[in-house]
């Protein structure tokens, strides 16, 4: 027997209302409901007094919102999910510390020089907007590690912006000597960056109003605000770089603070995804 989509929602909201939620599972389940939103709204039991959804005070079931159209209700649903995630998702910092401590011991045994970086968001950050998790609901995805149950900044993204900066400053030949190319392995390695400590929340909801189509006049335009999740300001991320040739480390250590201030992630040109270097430790 096919189960109504509305029966999934109590389980989803219960998951989102708990501390230490598994965000990957919660957003994946929520996407099912969002993708079948019409079925949920058309179900006769949706507004029943006996519906277990009502105990969660879900915003689309409140009397003042029952007359809104489907798109307005979807927007309210997005907002509530974003607020639940922001309020209840907690960082498991000890797991991240253990991961980096173990990795550092392995790298030291292999005679690598290690640089331990901590960077902190100065603004709200958008990382991995083209990835699938959360994209169906919020129109932008989140780079997320289901094993660590944490958002992360991919090593490839950090390496890419540092390489681009060094190419501009030192030239392509020096950049290839450090980072390699299709035919030659590079002399420096990066890890993914994981959050270690937020000042308050790890995620915060945000609203972006898209620009109207240039073919329309401003008076005719009806831009619809897009609700999505962002990494909160003042969240610290940690990552390592490691190498065996000392001459490749200095250009990276010199350039990285400048690079991250210009932005690491999406929409940096309009004030998102700006970071600052908060800690650096070199281990030889």
UniProtKB/Swiss-Prot annotation:
Source superkingdom: Archaea
Principal location listed in the UniProt entry: cytoplasm
GO cellular component entries: cytoplasm
Keyword Kinase recorded: no
Keywords from the UniProt entry: Antiviral defense, Cytoplasm
Any Gene Ontology biological process: defense response to virus
Places the protein is found: Cytoplasm
Keyword Cytoplasm carried by entry: yes
Role description: CRISPR (clustered regularly interspaced short palindromic repeat) is an adaptive immune system that provides protection against mobile genetic elements (viruses, transposable elements and conjugative plasmids). CRISPR clusters contain spacers, sequences complementary to antecedent mobile elements, and target invading nucleic acids. CRISPR clusters are transcribed and processed into CRISPR RNA (crRNA). The CMR complex degrades RNA complementary to the crRNA (target RNA) within UA dinucleotides, generating 3'-OH and 5'-phosphate ends.
Subunit structure: Part of the CMR ribonucleoprotein complex, consisting of crRNA plus Cmr1/Cmr2/Cmr3/Cmr4/Cmr5/Cmr6 at 1:1 and possibly 3 Cmr7 dimers. A Cmr2/Cmr3/Cmr7 subcomplex without crRNA can also be isolated. It does not cleave target RNA.
Annotated family: Belongs to the CRISPR system Cmr6 family.
Protein name in UniProt: CRISPR system CMR subunit Cmr6
Source organism per UniProt: Saccharolobus solfataricus (strain ATCC 35092 / DSM 1617 / JCM 11322 / P2)
Lineage per the UniProt record: Archaea, Thermoproteota, Thermoprotei, Sulfolobales, Sulfolobaceae
UniProt gene name: cmr6
């Amino acid at each position: 027997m096919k189960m109504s989509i509305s029966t999934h929602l109590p389980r989803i909201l219960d998951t989102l209302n708990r501390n230490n939620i598994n965000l990957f599972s919660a957003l994946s389940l929520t996407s099912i409901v969002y993708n079948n939103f019409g079925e949920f709204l058309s179900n006769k039991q949706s507004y029943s007094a006996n519906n277990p959804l009502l105990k969660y005070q879900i915003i689309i079931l409140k009397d003042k919102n029952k007359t809104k159209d489907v798109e307005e209700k979807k927007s309210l649903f997005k907002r509530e999910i974003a607020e639940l995630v922001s309020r209840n998702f907690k960082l498991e910092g000890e797991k991240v510390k253990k991961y980096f401590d173990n990795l550092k011991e392995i790298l030291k045994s292999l005679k690598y020089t290690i640089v331990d970086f901590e960077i902190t968001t100065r603004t709200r950050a958008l990382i991995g907007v083209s990835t699938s998790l959360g994209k169906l609901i919020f129109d932008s995805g989140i780079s997320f590690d289901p094993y660590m149950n944490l958002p992360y900044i991919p090593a490839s993204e950090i390496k890419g912006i540092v390489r681009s900066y060094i190419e501009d400053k030192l030239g392509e030949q020096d950049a290839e000597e450090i980072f390699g190319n299709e035919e030659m392995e590079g002399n420096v390695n990066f890890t993914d960056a994981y959050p270690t400590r937020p000042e308050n929340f790890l995620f915060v909801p945000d609203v972006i109003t898209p620009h109207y189509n240039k073919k329309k006049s401003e008076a005719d335009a009806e831009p619809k605000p897009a609700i999505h999740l962002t990494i909160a300001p003042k969240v610290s991320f940690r990552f390592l770089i490691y190498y065996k040739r000392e001459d490749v480390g200095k250009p990276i250590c010199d350039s990285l603070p400048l690079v991250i201030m210009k932005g690491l992630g999406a929409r940096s040109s309009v004030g998102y995804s700006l970071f600052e270097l908060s800690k650096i430790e070199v281990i030889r």
